[in-house]
């Protein structure tokens, strides 16, 4: 998620104002203006008049707390979650999905235009269901000795405190139904005071959980977890430390993409929103327009979410990743899916990839999917490879806009941009962009 504003605060004298909200920022905050300064107001929507209390004042902007709405806009809806406003997981359930997507898309277009100097008309937003989409979640666990009670939930807004969660409508239904029986199971463990967190993941072959415990579990607790797993049909993994995971019971997880089966480790990164991921991969394939005689490079490839589907179309695909475990997983999946034309390499992506032995033959197309920090150290090396097309998948519009400047300066054209509504009701803004080689760029 891009950070557009400094989080540092300055205490001010409380001042009450009546303002009209003009727009919604990508994080779901209403934006009003007073005396030439923007005011960000959580909970307020465009077109609404609101009575607010200023809580923070900076030179360029202020923040306000919503005290009272004087009218309600048509885009305001009733949040589906009883914890909304307290739980920090979602910020925008009070706005309908059309308004959320429009505000994020507008922010994306403005940012790219400002940083890169050009932005084509955005293609329609890639999206899925606004609820029931999350196939992965991590819940904190904390035992309260005075109440003799376990807390299980997400962090409160702007706090480290937990909100006890019994329902979470953004979770896939297969995971949400586990919340209550899971809480009851964990509350009954002898090790209840020494639990850290629990991760829930929905694989295509069923749900799994990873329990972080701080002491060795006794046999009675292991038996209780096995009973829970059998009763709820959940695979259970135990994490006695932050590095190692022990399978207690269940099948190895996998998910399917473009007709391929990708096995993954319970702690491997997989895209949270399966529906959007399927569309995202299909769009990347269409934009790259891979031909049977072409070589394709996939940077920041992970375990092969894009790499392996591309290998079904290209003569050869090379995936490069900085995490060794993901490289091993990609190699395993290439073998299991009978794709001998794909190779995975563990490399420092800040080094000059154009000088690597596997790059000497060059590449016709390049895809990259970096983390939030972007790919500043990689862009100049991509230019050296002179691919005909580059697809950049981004989870941070600020670094996408920054990195695109390198390609534009090298003669590439920003041909298409799409926003991905990967995380409805949150401030996360994901996108993808296609850059095409213009005539005169050497190959």
From Swiss-Prot:
Signal peptide: none annotated. [4Fe-4S] cluster binds at residues 81, 87, 90, 168. Transmembrane segments: none annotated. Keywords: 4Fe-4S, Iron, Iron-sulfur, Metal-binding, Methyltransferase, rRNA processing, S-adenosyl-L-methionine, Transferase. The active site is at residue 395. InterPro entries: 23S_rRNA_MeTrfase_RlmD, MeTrfase_TrmA_AS, MeTrfase_TrmA_CS, NA-bd_OB-fold, SAM-dependent_MTases_sf, TRAM_dom, U5_MeTrfase_fam. One of its GO terms (biological process) is rRNA base methylation. GO terms for molecular function: 4 iron, 4 sulfur cluster binding; iron ion binding; RNA binding; rRNA (uridine-C5-)-methyltransferase activity. S-adenosyl-L-methionine binds at residues 271, 300, 305, 321, 348, 369. Residues 10-68 form the TRAM domain. Gene3D superfamilies: 2.40.50.1070, Nucleic acid-binding proteins (2.40.50.140), Vaccinia Virus protein VP39 (3.40.50.150). It catalyses: uridine(1939) in 23S rRNA + S-adenosyl-L-methionine = 5-methyluridine(1939) in 23S rRNA + S-adenosyl-L-homocysteine + H(+). It is an enzyme of class 2 (transferase). The keyword Nucleotidyltransferase does not apply. Its EC number is 2.1.1.190. Catalyzes the formation of 5-methyl-uridine at position 1939 (m5U1939) in 23S rRNA. This is 23S rRNA (uracil(1939)-C(5))-methyltransferase RlmD. The lineage of its organism: Bacteria, Pseudomonadati, Pseudomonadota, Gammaproteobacteria, Enterobacterales.
């Amino acid at each position: 998620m891009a950070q557009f504003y400094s989080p540092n605060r300055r205490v001010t004298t409380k001042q009450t104002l009546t303002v009209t909200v003009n727009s919604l920022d990508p994080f779901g905050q209403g934006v009003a203006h007073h005396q030439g300064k923007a005011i960000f107001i959580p909970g307020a929507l465009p077109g609404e008049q609101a009575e607010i209390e200023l809580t923070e004042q900076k030179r360029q902007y202020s923040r306000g707390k919503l005290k009272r709405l004087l009218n309600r806009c048509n885009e305001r809806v009733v949040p589906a979650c009883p914890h909304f406003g307290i739980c920090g997981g979602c910020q925008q359930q009070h706005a309908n999905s059309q308004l959320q997507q429009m505000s994020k898309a507008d922010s994306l277009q403005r940012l790219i235009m400002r940083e890169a100097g050009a932005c084509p008309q955005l293609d329609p937003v890639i999206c899925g269901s606004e609820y029931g989409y999350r196939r992965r979640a991590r819940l904190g666990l904390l035992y309260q000795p005075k109440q003799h009670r376990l807390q299980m939930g997400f962090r409160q807004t702007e706090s480290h405190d937990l909100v006890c969660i019994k329902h979470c409508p953004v979770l896939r239904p297969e995971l949400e139904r586990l919340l209550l029986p899971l809480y009851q199971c964990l509350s009954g463990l002898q090790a209840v005071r020494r639990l850290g967190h629990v991760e829930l993941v929905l694989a295509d072959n069923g749900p799994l959980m990873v329990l972080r415990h701080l002491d060795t579990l006794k046999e009675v607790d292991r038996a209780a977890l096995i009973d829970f797993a059998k009763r709820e049909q959940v695979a259970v993994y135990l994490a006695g430390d932050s590095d190692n995971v022990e399978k207690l019971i269940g099948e190895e997880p996998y998910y399917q993409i473009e007709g391929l089966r990708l096995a993954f480790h319970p702690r491997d990164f997989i895209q949270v929103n399966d529906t959007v991921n399927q569309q995202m991969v299909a769009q990347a394939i269409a934009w790259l327009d891979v031909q049977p005689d072409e070589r394709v490079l996939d940077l920041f490839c992970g375990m092969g979410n894009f790499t392996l589907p591309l290998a079904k179309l290209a003569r050869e695909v090379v995936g490069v990743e900085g995490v060794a475990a993901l490289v091993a997983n990609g190699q395993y999946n290439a073998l299991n899916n009978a794709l001998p034309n794909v190779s995975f390499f563990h490399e420092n992506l800040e080094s000059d990839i154009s000088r690597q032995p596997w790059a000497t033959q060059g590449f016709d197309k390049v895809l990259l999917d970096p983390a939030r920090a972007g790919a500043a150290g990689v862009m100049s090396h991509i230019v050296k490879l002179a691919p005909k097309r580059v697809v950049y998948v981004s989870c941070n519009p600020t670094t996408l806009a920054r990195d695109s400047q390198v390609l534009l300066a090298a003669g590439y054209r920003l041909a298409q941009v799409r926003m991905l509504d990967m995380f409805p009701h949150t401030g996360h803004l994901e996108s993808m962009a296609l850059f095409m080689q213009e005539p005169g760029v050497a190959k």
